[in-house]
């Protein structure tokens, strides 16, 4: 089996369908004997340039190990699913399991925001 990195972008109006799509695609990979090494839902993000007059899209990243037939099936599903506006399937040399820079940045942003709120709360409590 080969390793692949898969990124697909979903129309922002169809964001509520993303969990079902992820479940369907991961199910197809695992039932055929493949494994999912990394799955990240990056959420709705700004596009670098408009695609079909859209400025935002819902991003999903997957690193998988699967047979070529399953990847062909996924590619066909992406092509005929109107909610998927772009996709990229890239073969990699090895399994990637560490957290992506996108997810790290999002995590750091949330922890920094939580730390600032805690500091403000302790300052407000000490002033009283």
Curated annotation (Swiss-Prot):
Alphabetized UniProt keyword annotations: Ribonucleoprotein, Ribosomal protein, RNA-binding, rRNA-binding
SUPFAM superfamilies: Ribosomal protein S6 (SSF54995)
GO BP annotations, alphabetical order: translation
Keyword Hydrolase: no
Region (Disordered) residue spans: 100-128
Residue intervals passing through the bilayer: none
CDD domains linked: bS6
Bias (Basic and acidic residues): 104-121
A molecular function GO annotation: structural constituent of ribosome
Pfam family, any one: Ribosomal_S6
Assigned protein family: Belongs to the bacterial ribosomal protein bS6 family.
Function recorded in the entry: Binds together with bS18 to 16S ribosomal RNA.
Annotated protein name in UniProt: Small ribosomal subunit protein bS6
Gene source species: Aeromonas hydrophila subsp. hydrophila (strain ATCC 7966 / DSM 30187 / BCRC 13018 / CCUG 14551 / JCM 1027 / KCTC 2358 / NCIMB 9240 / NCTC 8049)
